[in-house]
Amino acid sequence: TAATPNGRHAGEPLNDGGISPTHGDDTKGATAIFKSAGKLCNVRAGHGSVLNQLLHPSIFKGEESDKVFGEYMRSICDCGVWETQFNVLTKEDLLQAQKHPDEYRSLVVRVAGYSAFFTVLGKGVQDDIIDRTSLMQY
């Protein structure tokens, strides 16, 4: 793809899924992302529209984390977003897997509509996953 006016360089992906935000443009948190995605008309998206989110593991700490995540998922569906994929990792974990692939051979990630072992993906795809915004709150 060609470069775009927002500073994205030629050859870089537009986004990592049908309705995922462009890297770095998701600055208002996870809730704002799915509310925006829910406003899209996906009637002509014959193969579906996926929303990818990289969640920081700290979101799942605490007594209420399961309940809060369930409410978050219900809210996503209430907004009309029907296909959401999550990676629950830190950027540091992904960078370490890139540097030491033998130690992370079993690390599976959601790419964009499919899962793959992180260490067998090409560096460009790995970098794209690492560049996703790690959301630390809903």
Go through each PLM region and give its residues.
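Acidic, glycine-enriched catalytic cores built around paired aspartates
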Residues: 1-138
